[in-house]
Amino acid sequence: MKIEVIKRDKNLLEFYLVGEDHTFANLLSETLHENKHVTFAAYTIEHPVLMARKPRFRISTDGKITPEKALEEAAQKIFDRAKDVLEVWEGVIKK
């Protein structure tokens, strides 16, 4: 995964998420929406073949946090949830 910044302003961040597709992009978008300071979070796949693994994101915030901070918090939340699932799974398979 690689992030290519397209545009960065005080309350706006646009970037490509290189190497990912709808699976992670949708999870990230939904997790960003859980943050009360995120006013807009969405992605698009600009071309279904040529850009299939390069979603373009746009994140806007209310100014209380930066879009970069919102992205960082969403990534951490996804990581924590995945860790919780792994711990539950490990508990199940050890029984």
UniProtKB/Swiss-Prot annotation:
CDD domains: RNAP_L
Gene3D superfamilies reported for this sequence: RNA polymerase, RBP11-like subunit
Localisation: Cytoplasm
One of the Pfam families matching this protein, by short name: RNA_pol_L_2
Gene Ontology BP term (one): DNA-templated transcription
Enzyme class per UniProt: transferase
Protein name: DNA-directed RNA polymerase subunit Rpo11
Organism listed in the record: Thermococcus sibiricus (strain DSM 12597 / MM 739)
